[in-house]
UniProtKB/Swiss-Prot annotation:
<dbReference type="GO" id="GO:0051087">
    <property type="term" value="F:protein-folding chaperone binding"/>
</dbReference>
<feature type="compositionally biased region" description="Basic and acidic residues">
    <location>
        <begin position="7"/>
        <end position="20"/>
    </location>
</feature>
<dbReference type="InterPro" id="IPR013805">
    <property type="entry name" value="GrpE_coiled_coil"/>
</dbReference>
<feature type="region of interest" description="Disordered">
    <location>
        <begin position="1"/>
        <end position="26"/>
    </location>
</feature>
<protein>
    <recommendedName>
        <fullName>Protein GrpE</fullName>
    </recommendedName>
</protein>
<keyword id="KW-0143">Chaperone</keyword>
<dbReference type="GO" id="GO:0006457">
    <property type="term" value="P:protein folding"/>
</dbReference>
<dbReference type="GO" id="GO:0042803">
    <property type="term" value="F:protein homodimerization activity"/>
</dbReference>
<comment type="subunit">
    <text>Homodimer.</text>
</comment>
<dbReference type="GO" id="GO:0005737">
    <property type="term" value="C:cytoplasm"/>
</dbReference>
<dbReference type="InterPro" id="IPR000740">
    <property type="entry name" value="GrpE"/>
</dbReference>
<comment type="similarity">
    <text>Belongs to the GrpE family.</text>
</comment>
<dbReference type="InterPro" id="IPR009012">
    <property type="entry name" value="GrpE_head"/>
</dbReference>
<comment type="function">
    <text>Participates actively in the response to hyperosmotic and heat shock by preventing the aggregation of stress-denatured proteins, in association with DnaK and GrpE. It is the nucleotide exchange factor for DnaK and may function as a thermosensor. Unfolded proteins bind initially to DnaJ; upon interaction with the DnaJ-bound protein, DnaK hydrolyzes its bound ATP, resulting in the formation of a stable complex. GrpE releases ADP from DnaK; ATP binding to DnaK triggers the release of the substrate protein, thus completing the reaction cycle.</text>
</comment>
<dbReference type="GO" id="GO:0000774">
    <property type="term" value="F:adenyl-nucleotide exchange factor activity"/>
</dbReference>
<keyword id="KW-0346">Stress response</keyword>
<dbReference type="Pfam" id="PF01025">
    <property type="entry name" value="GrpE"/>
</dbReference>
Amino acid sequence: MTKKHHKEQEEIQETIKTEAAEENVGDETVAIPAATESDIEAEIAARDAEIQKLRDEVMRRAAEFENFRKQKEREAAQSGKRMLENTVRDLLPLLDDLKRLMEHIPAELQEMAEAKPFVEGVELIRKNFKSLLESKGVKEIEALGKVLDVNFHEAITQIDVPDTEPDTIVQEYQTGYTLGDRVIRHAKVIVAK
């Protein structure tokens, strides 16, 4: 071999070694900068903080949704109660009229054979109507003989009544009603002076 040929072969071998070293990194340990333990702990802490932040956000959103759901349920229940109150308030004059009708039927008419079924029918309608309202939670406010309570009674006038305490209800002009714990209509009453 000539020197020239020998030199070319050495250059080729050198090139091959260089290329192999560049391509075959697996044969050598690659120098990656080693992360310090404090860097890893800081990264873990940052990720834990982010996870906790996301958990808190999820919990907050869940609580907001639950509050929203409860609020809508309360609003629906209140709306139903208001609707029932308004309906009952509108029906009370009918009950008053049936009561007045029964109070003003003359005794002779009540005893007449021809009128007795009519009178009994009107009384039955009044009782059934009153029972229906009671089944919905409507109750009459007791008034006669009670001391005036402005939460339930409305005094329309005062009269002198011997041997009666002042502010005692002596006559009921219009019956009052409650629905549950709410007054639908105050009892209109006459009280003693």
